[in-house]
């Protein structure tokens, strides 16, 4: 019952926020101001996304990530960055027609006009670090969904030009550039 009260409280707070946000957005649009949001590729382990859709993430039966996200050593950090976000089960997400990703993007686009994709390079390939590692030096690159996700997204959103802006930090390979250029992000 305490959880139910907490859930109800957050539902009311979110309802009020979104109602107020819509008024802000309408005021911006009336002045021809577009709003840009931010969408990180990975979600937090303790997020509602992971809680509600555990099967879409690389977790063991008790819900602990089997591998986590980060980036290898680079000019920002000699030991890389160990973010700790669970990796996706891209195979299951693909089988669903990328439904979860489509819904995620639709949700953010209900709130903003354009979206900066944080760690865009992860859609081409992302750094996967074994559970328990203390640095990101021990990871490996794993293939992401690439162009297929963005093609499906274009169809689902009914647009020729996706309203996304790709972040280009980190290890940007020719394949990442080709993906970004192909979709003009």
Regions found by a protein language model. Give the residues of each.
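Alpha-amylase-like alpha-glycosidases and glucanotransferases acting on alpha-linked glucans and related
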Residues: 1-18, 42-185
């Amino acid at each position: 019952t305490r959880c139910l009260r907490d859930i109800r409280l957050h539902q009311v707070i979110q309802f009020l926020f979104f109602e107020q946000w819509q008024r802000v957005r309408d005021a911006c649009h009336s002045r021809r101001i577009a709003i840009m949001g931010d969408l990180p590729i990975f979600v937090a382990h303790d997020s509602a996304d992971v809680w509600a859709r555990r099967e879409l993430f690389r977790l063991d039966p008790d819900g602990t990530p089997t591998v986590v996200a980060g980036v290898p050593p680079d000019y920002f950090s000699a030991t890389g960055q160990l973010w700790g976000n669970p990796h996706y089960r891209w195979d299951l997400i693909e089988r669903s027609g990328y439904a979860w990703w489509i819904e995620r993007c639709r949700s953010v686009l209900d709130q903003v006009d354009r979206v900066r994709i944080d760690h865009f390079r992860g859609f081409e390939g992302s750094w996967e670090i074994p559970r328990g590692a203390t640095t990101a030096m021990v990871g490996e690159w794993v293939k992401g969904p690439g162009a297929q996700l963005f093609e499906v997204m274009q169809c689902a959103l009914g647009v020729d030009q996706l309203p996304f802006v790709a972040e280009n930090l980190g290890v940007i390979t020719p394949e990442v550039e080709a993906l970004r250029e192909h979709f003009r992000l």
